[in-house]
């Protein structure tokens, strides 16, 4: 959510900035609603004051034994008019709230202006793209040939966009989770956190998934209004909702492993084969809560921490700055890490690292006390995948395959697999 004061005082500036995203904000209509709100608030307060004075006068007249019926009728008329204006004011406030909750974040000035992913800017590359002397296979071809990845069985159990993994591939998938957690906890200093995988609407509103992106979520039946979490960013970030932190507590740096559940609405026909885009997948998430002045340094650190995982696994990747037309609605600035997939002969996203600035904090009322001014200020929130586990498995399978369809284990993962150094076709 954007700053209400900014929206009220300079809606045209907001409209200009959001237009960089391709988002149309009707500043004129918003300004008209604001003028109505201000007029109604002044009028309502005036009527309230007048009714209070008249009510007091009735009490005084009654104590003197005077006829108070005419005065009471006037107060009743004032009361009816007051209730009518309160109803009108509530309706205006609801309209303003609906607009406010629909607005995306203002992009940071350093974000490249562009329309879509074609306008994203490559920042750096790491690692050499492997040169194979044989026709490469995709991860799903490799996994099925190994007899350890079964999409047809998953479809029978549930439906499309699910997978069953067995044997060493399932073990490798689990090893990746532990490896990522160990690096982030032991070397990067994150605190591990375990959170619910089911969240309520308030949490989703706080991090910005609701009301705009409900179609992307799996909602549970029943009266609780619960949803399966689409990313642990949601429950982890909401741990500071409605809190006033001390400056000494910041930055907070959490790492969390969780399954994620997404409906993939709008993804019809995209990545229909394999594990690239699934309804259920695992992720190791990094979340930072910082002071405003520290958040952009934090974004660089968070991104580098995610990069370390790819470097330890010796997977070629690149870092891309998303343009204004491609960044998520709540993000002020985002770096994507894209790993090389030989079967597609291209880089594919494996992590998004974002600075949300105060966008989520304003929704969550997540604040801290500034020791210099003693004022209560909004924190900044950041998040990034460190990494998406399934896509990391995909990248290992494809980059570490040999001509026989075997998968060689990266050196960094061998201690997690009890000495296994190759997953072989039988």
UniProtKB/Swiss-Prot annotation:
SUPFAM superfamilies for the chain: Class II aaRS and biotin synthetases, tRNA-binding arm
The protein's Enzyme Commission number: 6.1.1.11
Reaction catalysed by this enzyme: tRNA(Ser) + L-serine + ATP = L-seryl-tRNA(Ser) + AMP + diphosphate + H(+); tRNA(Sec) + L-serine + ATP = L-seryl-tRNA(Sec) + AMP + diphosphate + H(+)
Gene3D superfamilies according to UniProt: Bira Bifunctional Protein, Domain 2, Serine-tRNA synthetase, tRNA binding domain
One term of GO molecular function: ATP binding
Binding site for ATP: 262-264, 349-352
PROSITE patterns with a match to the protein in the record: AA_TRNA_LIGASE_II
Short name of any one Pfam family annotated for the protein: Seryl_tRNA_N
GO cellular component entries: cytoplasm
Domain of life: Bacteria
UniProt pathway: Aminoacyl-tRNA biosynthesis; selenocysteinyl-tRNA(Sec) biosynthesis; L-seryl-tRNA(Sec) from L-serine and tRNA(Sec): step 1/1
Keywords: Aminoacyl-tRNA synthetase, ATP-binding, Cytoplasm, Ligase, Nucleotide-binding, Protein biosynthesis
Described purpose of this protein according to its UniProt entry: Catalyzes the attachment of serine to tRNA(Ser). Is also able to aminoacylate tRNA(Sec) with serine, to form the misacylated tRNA L-seryl-tRNA(Sec), which will be further converted into selenocysteinyl-tRNA(Sec).
Family listed: Belongs to the class-II aminoacyl-tRNA synthetase family. Type-1 seryl-tRNA synthetase subfamily.
Complex formation: Homodimer. The tRNA molecule binds across the dimer.
This protein's name: Serine--tRNA ligase
Provenance organism: Legionella pneumophila (strain Paris)
């Amino acid at each position: 959510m954007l700053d209400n004061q900014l929206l009220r005082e300079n809606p045209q500036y907001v409209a200009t900035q959001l237009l960089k995203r391709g988002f149309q904000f009707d500043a004129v209509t918003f300004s008209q609603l604001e003028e109505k709100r201000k007029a109604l608030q002044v009028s309502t307060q005036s009527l309230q004051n007048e009714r209070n004075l008249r009510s007091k006068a009735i009490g005084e007249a009654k104590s003197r034994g005077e006829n108070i019926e005419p005065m009471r009728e006037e107060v009743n008329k004032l009361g009816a008019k007051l209730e009518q204006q309160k109803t009108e004011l509530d309706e205006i406030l609801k309209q303003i709230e609906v607009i406010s909750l629909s607005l995306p974040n203002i992009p940071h000035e350093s974000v490249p202006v562009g329309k879509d992913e074609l306008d994203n800017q490559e920042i750096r590359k790491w690692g050499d793209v492997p040169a194979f002397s044989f026709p490469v296979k995709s991860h799903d071809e490799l996994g099925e040939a190994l007899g350890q990845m079964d999409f047809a069985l998953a479809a029978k159990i549930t439906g499309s966009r699910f997978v069953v993994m067995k044997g060493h591939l399932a073990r490798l998938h689990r090893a990746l989770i532990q490896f990522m957690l160990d690096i982030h906890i032991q070397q990067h200093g994150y605190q591990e956190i375990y959170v619910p995988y089911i969240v309520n609407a308030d949490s989703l509103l706080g991090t910005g998934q609701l009301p705009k992106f409900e179609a992307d979520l799996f909602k549970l039946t029943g009266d609780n209004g619960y949803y399966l979490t689409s990313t642990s960013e949601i429950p982890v970030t909401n741990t500071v909702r409605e809190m006033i932190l001390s400056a000494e507590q910041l930055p907070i740096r959490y790492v969390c492993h969780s399954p994620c559940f997404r409906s993939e609405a709008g993804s019809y026909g995209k990545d229909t084969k394999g594990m690239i885009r699934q309804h259920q997948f695992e992720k190791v998430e990094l979340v930072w809560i910082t002071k405003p002045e520290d958040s952009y340094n934090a974004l660089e650190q968070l991104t580098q921490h995610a990069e370390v995982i790819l470097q330890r696994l010796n997977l070629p990747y690149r870092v891309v700055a998303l343009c204004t037309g491609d960044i998520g609605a709540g993000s002020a600035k985002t770096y994507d890490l894209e790993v090389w997939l030989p079967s597609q002969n291209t880089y594919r996203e494996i992590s998004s690292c974002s600075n949300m600035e105060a966008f989520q904090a304003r929704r969550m009322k997540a604040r801290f006390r500034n020791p210099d001014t003693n004022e209560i200020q909004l924190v900044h929130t950041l998040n990034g995948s460190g990494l998406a586990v399934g896509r990391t498995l995909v990248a290992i399978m494809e980059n570490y395959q040999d001509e026989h369809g075997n998968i060689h284990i990266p050196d960094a993962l061998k201690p997690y697999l009890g000495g296994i150094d190759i997953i072989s076709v039988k």
